[in-house]
Amino acid sequence: MDKRIFILALAAFTVGSVELVIAGILDMIARDLRVSVGVAGQLVSVYSLVFALGSPVLIALTTKVERRRLLVIAMLVFTAGNIMSMLSPNFTMLLLSRVILAASCSIVVVLSITLASGIVTPEAKGRAIGMIFMGISGALVLGVPLGTLIGEAWGWRATFAFIGVLSFIVTICIMKFLPQAASPPKLPMREQLRTLGNSKIVFAHLVSILQMTGQFTIYAYITPFLQTMLNLSPGQISFVLLVYGLAGIAGGWIGGWAADRFGAARTMIVTLLLHAVAILLL
């Protein structure tokens, strides 16, 4: 594997961990900051909203910034956001830190995908992008269970401290090993909005919105659900999250390989059909 792709996947893993680990420590945060689990769930809602709305806006506003430099800045802001989360004295401050984390994370994810696809040959783009998504899925396998265990051992603040240290290490690797990448030609916002007139693009956005909404609606409250409804122990819950993450990693690799082999359209159709079958089996 190209070490540059690995570093970008590691960056995706790091930011994915802070996005997803909240599910494993939500009940700890609620108890410590004296809010209900429902109120604590706003940490997920606000994060998702800022990520979705901030990503296109921030990328558009930073088109003149060299891509590696922008990635480094985003990672440093992400590190600062973790420090802020760790030191938050109340829920309001923690919620504000989630805004900072989501904004920086949105830039890191987009840049990781675009830089990875630009590093490899056209024939390997699908696998390179798949590796980035494997990094995000890897956050489910290692980041979430490990972050949950750290939270149970030393408190939820230690979880953010761990991710902050990891993100700083990744930032150093980006500065050392990734080459500079020219900024893409600036596309006016009006031209970008015109793409919404394309029914195929709108449908693709709709599929992504529905899929992510369904995924994070259940995932945000998976720990309290497994505790109260199925009476699972912390160890059993970590195992459930591990299986979920392993499936995500396998899907990222298979999806990237299938896109290169059979084309993106066919791969998407088969994937959506499998989703439909899984829902029917429920």
List where the protein language model places each region:
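Cytoplasmic helix-loop-helix junction between adjacent transmembrane helices
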Residues: 97-135
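Extracytoplasmic gate region of multi-pass secondary transporters
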Residues: 202-242
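Helix-breaking motifs and short loop linkers at transmembrane-helix boundaries and internal kinks
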Residues: 34, 66, 87-93, 231, ...
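Structural signature of the two symmetry-related core transmembrane helices
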Residues: 70-83, 266-280
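Conserved MFS/SLC helix-loop-helix module at the cytosolic interface between two early adjacent transmembrane helices
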Residues: 53-92
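Helix-loop-helix hairpin linking two adjacent transmembrane segments in secondary transporters
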Residues: 93, 122, 130-176, 221, ...
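Extracytoplasmic
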Residues: 4-37, 55-58, 218-223
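Helix-to-loop junctions at the C-terminal end of transmembrane segments
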Residues: 55-66, 251-263
